[in-house]
Each structure stands twice: as structure tokens, then as C-alpha cells.
Amino acid sequence: MDSGAVPTNASNCTDPFTHPSSCSPAPSPSSWVNFSHLEGNLSDPCGPNRTELGGSDRLCPSAGSPSMITAIIIMALYSIVCVVGLFGNFLVMYVIVRYTKMKTATNIYIFNLALADALATSTLPFQSVNYLMGTWPFGTILCKIVISIDYYNMFTSIFTLCTMSVDRYIAVCHPVKALDLRTPRNAKIINICNWILSSAIGLPVMFMATTKYRQGSIDCTLTFSHPTWYWENLLKICVFIFAFIMPILIITVCYGLMILRLKSVRMLSGSKEKDRNLRRITRMVLVVVAVFIVCWTPIHIYVIIKALITIPETTFQTVSWHFCIALGYTNSCLNPVLYAFLDENFKRCFREFCIPTSSTIEQQNSTRIRQNTRDHPSTANTVDRTNHQLENLEAETTPLP
């Protein structure tokens, strides 16, 4: 919204999309945290609490002075999510890149999901500083980057989960077609397409994001054309439809058809081992999708209700909002944990990374030698000829019995 549309009273602190500087910043989990930018900014010390609470600021400390307990809890949450999310998601990406056996179509989609989550958690240090200072000190460029990353994360994640569900449907219900369609190359192309689709919202948001001086602090916020309320609510509704309702319908249809297929046949492929792996991977993807839906449904419902009706002020409402935010946070660091528990290949690769055995080290050295041989064939040929000459010389100089 433009500067003239920025509210100057306490009545907008509680809107999930409004962050006036007169309140203290709310915990902002990956994407919907900064969906507060739909009406507000990053430098709100109590986050989405005042408009939602009917204008009262009794639950919000004054600007720049969050209570010590609140600050400690929120900073601890930021730190845990940031460390676990970055380490876990980068470990997932490393394992997929490092091990040839992990370069399957499903795992390439998982790589895309991990990349989106890692980008989202990388914004938490900026949000932490913003919370403690009660202002945005990083300038306009970083403001644009942080806000756009949040939107990219939300849309790329849900689009990737949709893709994974369709991929599972093809693998289970159309195994013959799957041989041609489910290839790593096609998965990479689809991942790129998902990022391009996400740009339909990510790029406009980047241009809309800006910093504004207000009441002695700097807000990182979105600007909307007049009438502001119309464009704000239109964006909320579009996000609700295209980033929640439609993907959930696609995922539900895919898994409904898969369940019917799995119940109707005992053997999906000609091998019991392949059949077991197929069912295991399908179960893992289903759990990942279910966790995503559980984490994001409350905040989507909350925001769309607030866009349509006025919610009266209650303490329960404030607690509910922060609980929704916390759920959104946890999703960015939960997926690596799910892979570790649900997929034997990921579990084995994680174990090898954390506790390398002698056989693992030998295998890595062997892989490096083979790679060097492919990269430098002339050197390899020279070494082979030298070894052959030494063997001949040794045979010639060895005394006969």
C-alpha cells in the first residue's frame, strides 16, 4: 500500500497482513509470516495483533520494547528453526547431488522442496534482527529479496508437492507410461517450470516491496494501488485459491485414485521388492503432503476469514494466530526429519554422512579415482603403461628357480 494508506493508529497491528511499527514483531514463519506484507511490514513488533484485536494494544508492548520473555521465546524459536532448517535441507540437497543412486525423479522433486525451505529459513536471521530492533535496518533491496523469497517458498513448495502427487499417481496407476515420463531429466524441467510459475507472484511482490519511514522506525512492506482494500483482499483470495484450494484438490484426487488402485491389486509390478519400494515411496510422499497441509491450513483459513469478516477482539484469537504462525515455521524444517524416518535410502545416506565408515571412505576414494580417470584419460593411459613396463621389468629381473 502506498504511504498514504499506511495506518497510523493501533488498529492494524493484529491483521495477519499488517505490521505497524507501534507494536512488537510477531514470529514470522517462512511464507505466511511475510504474507503479513499483504497489508503491512516486517518491522511490526507484535505482528498481526492489533487490527485483529479490535484496536486494543493491551497485548502488545510499546514500540521497540518487547518483553524479555517474549523476545527470548521468539529468538529461541527463530534460532532452532533456522539451524535445523538450513542444516537439514542442505543435507538433503547434498545427499541427492552426492549419491548417484539418489538421483531419481522423486528425489529431484524433494531437492526442489528442500531448496525452497532452505531459502525460507535463510531469511530468519534478518527477521530476528528486525524483531529485536523494532525497525528494518537492511535497506530496500534486502526488503524486496526477503519478502519475495517468502512468496516463492510458499508457491514453489505447494506446486512441487502437487507435482510429486501427480508423479506418484503415474507411478502407481500407469506404470508403463511411467517408464517414459518419470525420468530425472523431466523432473528437472518440471522443477524449473514450478519456479517460473511461482514468479507470477514472486516478481510482482518484489517490485511492490519497499521500505517506509513511520513513527521513528523503518517498515519493510508492500505497496498497493488505490483502492488499497480491494487489491489487498484480491491478493489474499488469489493466494488462498491458487496456493491452497486448487493444489489440495489436485492432491486429493491423485491420492484417492492411488488408494483405489492399491486396494484393487495385490501386485503393482512383477517384483515383490519393487512393489514394496513403490508403496513405501508413495507412503512417504503422502506423509510429507499431509504434514504440509496440517501446517498451512490454519493460517490460510485464518487469513481468508479475516479478509471477509471482522473478528472481535479476544485473547484466544491472539494465541490462535501465534499458534498458526508456529505451525508454518515448523514445516520448513520438518521435511528432512520425515525423510530420515520414512525413507531407508535417505536414512542410510544421512548415516554415512554423519558417521562415515571405512568402507564408505574407500568407496568415495574409488569414485574419485574413476572420476579422475574419466577427466584425464591420457594420464590414466600413461599410468597404465608405466605399471605394465614395471611389471615386465620385474619379471625380467626376477631370478629363475
From Swiss-Prot:
Question: Where, in residue ranges, is this chain on the Cytoplasmic side?
Answer: 95-107, 167-186, 257-280, 340-401
- Could you tell me which SUPFAM superfamilies the record lists for this protein? Family A G protein-coupled receptor-like
**Region (Disordered), start-end ranges:** 365-389
Q: Does the keyword Acetylation apply?
A: no
Q: What happens to this protein after translation, modification-wise?
A: Phosphorylated. Differentially phosphorylated in basal and agonist-induced conditions. Agonist-mediated phosphorylation modulates receptor internalization. Phosphorylated by GRK2 in a agonist-dependent manner. Phosphorylation at Tyr-169 requires receptor activation, is dependent on non-receptor protein tyrosine kinase Src and results in a decrease in agonist efficacy by reducing G-protein coupling efficiency. Phosphorylated on tyrosine residues; the phosphorylation is involved in agonist-induced G-protein-independent receptor down-regulation. Ubiquitinated. A basal ubiquitination seems not to be related to degradation. Ubiquitination is increased upon formation of OPRM1:OPRD1 oligomers leading to proteasomal degradation; the ubiquitination is diminished by RTP4.
> What's in the GO CC field?
axon; dendrite; endosome; neuron projection; perikaryon; plasma membrane; synapse
Q: Where is this motif: NPxxY?
A: 335-339
Its topology with respect to the membrane? Multi-pass membrane protein
Spell out where lipidation (S-palmitoyl cysteine) occurs.
354
Instruction: Output the superkingdom of the source species.
Output: Eukaryota
Q: Where are the transmembrane segments?
A: 70-94, 108-132, 144-166, 187-208, 232-256, 281-307, 316-339
Positions in the Extracellular compartment:
1-69, 133-143, 209-231, 308-315
Q: Which GO terms describe its molecular function?
A: beta-endorphin receptor activity; G protein-coupled receptor activity; G-protein alpha-subunit binding; G-protein beta-subunit binding; morphine receptor activity; neuropeptide binding; voltage-gated calcium channel activity
Q: Does the keyword Kinase apply?
A: no
- Annotated compartments: Cell membrane; Cell projection, Axon; Perikaryon; Cell projection, Dendrite
Carbohydrate attachment sites?
A: 9, 12, 34, 41, 49
The disulfides recorded in the entry are 143-220
Q: Which residues carry this modification: Phosphotyrosine?
A: 169
Q: Which GO terms describe its biological process?
A: adenylate cyclase-inhibiting G protein-coupled acetylcholine receptor signaling pathway; adenylate cyclase-inhibiting G protein-coupled receptor signaling pathway; G protein-coupled opioid receptor signaling pathway; negative regulation of cytosolic calcium ion concentration; negative regulation of nitric oxide biosynthetic process; negative regulation of Wnt protein secretion; neuropeptide signaling pathway; phospholipase C-activating G protein-coupled receptor signaling pathway
Q: Which residues carry this modification: Phosphothreonine?
A: 373, 397
Describe the family membership recorded for this protein in Swiss-Prot or TrEMBL: Belongs to the G-protein coupled receptor 1 family.
Its biological purpose: Receptor for endogenous opioids such as beta-endorphin and endomorphin. Receptor for natural and synthetic opioids including morphine, heroin, DAMGO, fentanyl, etorphine, buprenorphin and methadone. Also activated by enkephalin peptides, such as Met-enkephalin or Met-enkephalin-Arg-Phe, with higher affinity for Met-enkephalin-Arg-Phe.
- Oligomeric and partner information: Forms homooligomers and heterooligomers with other GPCRs, such as OPRD1, OPRK1, OPRL1, NPFFR2, ADRA2A, SSTR2, CNR1 and CCR5 (probably in dimeric forms). Interacts with heterotrimeric G proteins; interaction with a heterotrimeric complex containing GNAI1, GNB1 and GNG2 stabilizes the active conformation of the receptor and increases its affinity for endomorphin-2, the synthetic opioid peptide DAMGO and for morphinan agonists. Interacts with PPL; the interaction disrupts agonist-mediated G-protein activation. Interacts (via C-terminus) with DNAJB4 (via C-terminus).
Q: What is this protein called?
A: Mu-type opioid receptor
Natural source organism? Bos taurus (Bovine)
